[in-house]
Structures are given as structure tokens and as C-alpha cells.
Curated annotation (Swiss-Prot):
Belongs to the purine/pyrimidine phosphoribosyltransferase family. The lineage of its organism: Bacteria, Pseudomonadati, Pseudomonadota, Gammaproteobacteria, Aeromonadales. This is Adenine phosphoribosyltransferase. The keyword Lyase does not apply. One of its GO terms (molecular function) is adenine phosphoribosyltransferase activity. Its main location: cytoplasm. It comes from the Bacteria. InterPro entries: Ade_phspho_trans, Adenine_PRTase, PRibTrfase_dom, PRTase-like. PROSITE patterns: PUR_PYR_PR_TRANSFER. The gene is apt. Pathway: Purine metabolism; AMP biosynthesis via salvage pathway; AMP from adenine: step 1/1. Homodimer.
Length: 181
């Protein structure tokens, strides 16, 4: 990946201190997607990086994974598969629950969206603890798909998501790594 393009992408991400609460450094990707050149560079970089890797589907997690996953799928001429919270998908689904700081949450995938043999790229905006993408990977594998990589615009390695996904056998690719709280 082109280092100058990566620096341009990183520079387009604003950091908001003490949001949503004191002590948090919020990484705001809306500043990236508001900038047409930065948004295009991000999509092109991911699509070009994965174009010749035999990927058959792009999966994005609700909701910001849709922002990046769908245009990457379009640029690669592939289908896009949304993984959503319960009650948002109209056909038969499989689901996976995962732990949150206080409680649990659940994600769902249409049962016919991934078929055995699909080679899948998971795309999301930010990797923190890895819980959402870990649950997404489990759904894809249960459906018979192979997760090639999980790609993120931003990774906060200090929060453990990189290690969690690597331990689950998932290669993590991040365009920008930042310290995280």
C-alpha cells in the first residue's frame, strides 16, 4: 500500500478528545467520508489491495462497515453482504451473540448470503476490542465461508482487537493504527 496515500487517509481522520466522555479520544471517520478525495483513496486502496486475492464476497458489519464495505464490493465487482442487529434482515437468519462491556449483543446474517466455498473479506471502519468482527467471523464460518482477511480503516491495537482476531485465525489489515482509549 502506498505510504503517501496512507498518510493522506490518516490526516483526514479527526480526533475528538473527551468524546463521548472524558478520557476518550474519539476517532471520527466522518471527516474522512466528507472528503471526496480521501474517501475515494480509501476505497481504491482497499479494492486494489484485494482485487487479485480470489475474494467472492464482501461482508460489512452494521453500521459503519456498510459505509466502506459496499463501495469496496462495487469497485471489485462483488456482492456485498450486510451483517446486522436482530430484526433488520427479512429472510431466514443465523445469529451470533457476543459480550459487551455491560451485557451482550447479537448479530445476524441471512442464511443464504454466504455459501460454502465463498472467500470473504470483512470490512469495518474501526477495530477496538474485536467483539463485533469476531462474531461476524463466526457467522461467516458457520455458513461455510472462508474469511480471507478483516480490513479496517482504523485499528486501536492497545484495545486488544488485533490480538483477538489473530488468535481466531483472522489476518487483520488496517490502513491506520492509532493509540486508543
Amino acid at each position: 500500500m502506498n505510504p503517501e496515500t496512507l498518510k493522506f487517509i490518516e490526516a483526514s481522520i479527526k480526533t475528538i478528545p473527551d468524546y463521548p466522555k472524558p478520557g476518550i479520544l474519539f476517532r471520527d471517520i466522518t471527516s474522512l467520508i466528507e472528503n471526496a478525495d480521501a474517501f475515494k483513496a480509501t476505497i481504491d486502496l482497499l479494492a486494489n489491495h484485494y482485487r487479485d486475492q480470489g475474494i467472492t464476497k464482501i461482508v460489512g458489519t452494521e453500521a459503519r462497515g456498510f459505509i466502506f464495505g459496499a463501495p469496496v464490493a462495487y469497485a471489485m465487482g462483488l456482492g456485498f453482504v450486510p451483517v446486522r442487529k436482530p430484526g433488520k434482515l427479512p429472510r431466514a437468519v443465523i445469529e451470533e451473540s457476543y459480550a459487551l462491556e455491560y451485557g451482550t449483543d447479537t448479530l445476524q446474517l441471512h442464511t443464504d448470503a454466504i455459501v460454502p466455498g465463498d472467500k470473504v473479506l470483512v470490512v469495518d471502519d474501526l477495530l477496538a476490542t474485536g467483539g463485533t468482527v469476531d462474531a461476524t467471523v463466526k457467522l461467516i464460518r458457520r455458513a461455510g465461508g472462508e474469511v480471507v482477511d478483516a480490513a479496517f480503516i482504523i485499528s486501536l491495537p492497545s484495545l486488544g482487537g488485533d490480538a483477538r482476531l489473530t488468535a481466531a485465525g483472522v489476518k487483520v489489515v488496517s490502513l491506520v493504527e492509532l493509540p486508543g482509549e
